[in-house]
Amino acid sequence: MCISDSLEAGVDLVCFSGDKLLGGPQAGIVVGQLELVELIARRPLARTLRSDTLTLAALQATLTHYLLDEAADQIPVWQMISAKPETLRAKARRIARGIPSATVEAALSVVGGGSMPSQTLPSFAVRLSGSTDGAQSVATKLRHADPPVVSRVQDGAVQLDVRTVLPRDERMLRKVLLEHLS
């Protein structure tokens, strides 16, 4: 159930995180009946928990994307969640091209976090197999690269879910893979 559904159903207060699925800065947000929100704001503890101006500015920018109906295009977490499988397959192929032992395979992305801990989405991954070092060793090598590459080991191979690779990071990821796997 989304926040607006909860409020429309008559819930007095809803507390949620500004990061996670909202895609903004890390912040605790309280919405609901004005008199209750004001009551919370007047409590002495609220002063120690309030957000600073930078957090509020980042939150305002994030919420503006929602108001302009551009969250899916402008907020990275929603770019990742809304990516189409055919787009992910093409991205995986671009990343895997020319990398020894790299293949492209269907995968499942776990949205994760406290908001959607078991929600999965169809995805594609670059599978790195056939290494004489073993999958754990390859994963460790990639984690210690500059920049680090976080992967998962599944079925004896390293798997890189491309859903979490932003377009601006594709070239850098290929560079790291070529440097450490050739």
Briefly describe each language-model feature range.
Residues 34-41, 67-77, 117-122, 155-156:
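Short acidic (Asp/Glu) and glycine-rich catalytic loops that position anionic groups and cofactors
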Residues 4-65:
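Conserved PLP-enzyme active-site core in the AAT-like
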